[in-house]
């Protein structure tokens, strides 16, 4: 499957990206002082968390595990030298609900990390 994303310079350090589903996103550099526009690297971390989260929720639903809430934190170290990239990434998984089966939750997270999350696989090529 091929995805096409069209990205157009908007102004200053801002770009508009049209996703394959027609949704438009504004991305750029926070150096311009506009904190409401995400940077490409921060969006990568968000994509990593969402990719894994989708896997985990899907797996837990199949295991009949009911969550009341679930969040993932992504923390990454950016290198000092150019090209700056994330060389270390850690994810924290937080589950909330009654009578949660920790063994099944750990299995779901492990399956996402080792087998299903394609974004995780891409991150493996450049980060610990």
Give the residues covered by each predicted segment.
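Alpha-helical metal-binding/catalytic segments enriched in His/Glu/Asp
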Residues: 51
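Extended beta-strand/beta-hairpin segments
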Residues: 1-46, 57-128
